[in-house]
């Protein structure tokens, strides 16, 4: 059966149709309502001892949040925990897996999901000897982890400041700094079963021992690497073809002042956002624009988010179109966790309302402390809290996603302009006694 109704917007042949309360019809669409100001909370995961440098990744197939943490006084091995979302916004964590993911004191680590249930790629700097990568497979039911063979990315010399980003199923891009030569390397990583292979590119020399980041736009495999040299934060563009990284253009100097803790996220429309601590302790963010159709990148003017920060992380709320800053707020309780949304407009951003999530000093979010999960309607993760370095989770709400799918009635067979009369092919049963939409 078919019905006719006024189109509330231009419709194309085959569009799925929802009916509005005024009797007009429109495309079924996702909706989003902003949570303003943002809300959030933190819950204790583990306080049995000190835990450091929590890095997080989301397994979309298994619907689990995974955290890799450094056990004990900054010199212990890496452990993996996972969180399951229950009713409401809270996560229930399993922190009982005691398998060490590495064998030597880590100087830095990062993790990404490889696109299938329980399968992750861990990259870490192993003591004074190497930077390495391996597949980590999680059995959530047991629970247990199994470890793939270790691949040396840098086989000799002390390394630090690593990062890794998923780039498709069983694909990733990573970076690691070799301390003895102050050289930053990038790696295109491919996984077959649990075996990792790599292709190496030299990014830069004279790289300082600060946080480095790598992020990629999965729509066009164009990415950004950020690192620090001569006290300035640098952005470098690259393209990725599935097996190799190619550097593009020249360095983009994001700062004219000394920086320290920094983070990076891809948002949308070829826009990345970098966030860092200024040498005057300000929290500063900029929009970086880069796509793979040209050889240059650009960045907008500095946006001051807060006046006294240190460690920080970024997540992108794709439903609410907000960049979420998560940072140690040195101006409140000597380091509580504060979150603040940023709205991108062209090459700049507007700053939303800042909200504190706790009242505890020395809260330390690392650059992958939070991950936005659309199906959970929020950004989730974990970080160390207090001088005892206990681990707490993060739960941040900046928008609520919805859909007009509950108003779905069928589809249109031909295009119609806004205000025109649409003929809708109704799917399902109809009421033969109803002669119109009124």
Residue map of PLM features:
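Extracellular receptor-binding modules and their adjoining Ser/Thr/Gly/Asp/Asn-rich linkers
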Residues: 1-64, 69-71, 80-86, 107-109, ...
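Residue-level signal for glycine
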Residues: 89-91, 144-145, 196, 245, ...
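A short beta-strand motif characteristic of beta-propeller blades
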Residues: 37-46, 94-101, 148-154, 198-204, ...
């Amino acid at each position: 059966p078919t019905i006719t109704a006024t189109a509330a917007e231009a419709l194309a042949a085959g569009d799925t149709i929802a009916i509005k309360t005024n009797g007009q019809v429109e495309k079924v669409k996702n909706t989003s309502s902003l949570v303003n100001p943002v809300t959030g909370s933190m819950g204790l995961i583990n306080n049995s001892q000190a835990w450091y440098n929590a890095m997080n990744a989301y397994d979309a197939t298994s619907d689990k949040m995974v955290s890799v943490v450094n056990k004990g006084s900054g010199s212990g091995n890496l452990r993996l925990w996972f969180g399951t979302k229950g009713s409401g916004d809270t996560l229930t964590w399993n922190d009982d897996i005691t398998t060490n993911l590495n064998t030597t004191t880590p100087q830095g680590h990062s993790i990404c999901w490889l696109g299938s249930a329980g399968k992750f790629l861990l990259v870490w700097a192993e003591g004074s000897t190497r930077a390495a990568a391996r597949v980590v497979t999680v059995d959530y039911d047991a629970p247990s982890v199994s470890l793939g063979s270790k691949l040396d990315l840098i086989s000799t010399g002390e390394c630090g400041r690593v990062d890794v980003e998923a780039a498709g199923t069983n694909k990733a891009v990573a970076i690691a700094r070799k301390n003895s030569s102050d050289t930053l390397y990038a790696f295109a990583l491919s996984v077959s079963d649990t075996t990792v292979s790599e292709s190496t590119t030299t990014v830069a020399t004279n790289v300082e021992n600060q946080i480095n980041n790598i992020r990629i736009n999965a729509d066009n495999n164009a990415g950004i690497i950020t690192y620090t040299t001569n006290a300035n934060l640098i952005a470098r563009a690259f393209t990725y073809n599935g097996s190799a990284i190619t550097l593009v253009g020249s360095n983009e100097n994001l700062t004219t002042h000394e920086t320290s803790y920094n983070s990076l996220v891809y948002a949308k429309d070829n826009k990345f956002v970098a966030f860092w601590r200024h040498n005057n302790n300000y929290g500063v963010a900029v929009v970086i624009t880069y796509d793979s159709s040209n050889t240059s990148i650009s960045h907008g003017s500095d946006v001051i988010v807060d006046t006294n920060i240190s460690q920080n992380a970024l997540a992108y709320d794709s439903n609410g179109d907000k960049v979420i800053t998560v940072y140690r707020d040195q101006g409140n309780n000597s380091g509580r966790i504060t979150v603040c949304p940023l709205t991108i407009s062209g090459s700049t951003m507007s700053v939303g309302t800042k909200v504190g999530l706790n009242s505890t000093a020395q809260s330390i979010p690392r650059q992958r402390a939070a991950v936005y999960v659309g199906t959970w309607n929020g950004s989730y993760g974990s970080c160390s809290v207090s001088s005892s370095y206990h681990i707490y989770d993060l739960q941040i709400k900046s928008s609520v996603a919805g859909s007009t799918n509950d108003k779905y009635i069928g589809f249109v067979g031909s295009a119609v302009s806004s205000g025109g009369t649409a003929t809708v092919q109704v799917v399902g049963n109809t009421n033969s006694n109803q002669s119109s939409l009124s």
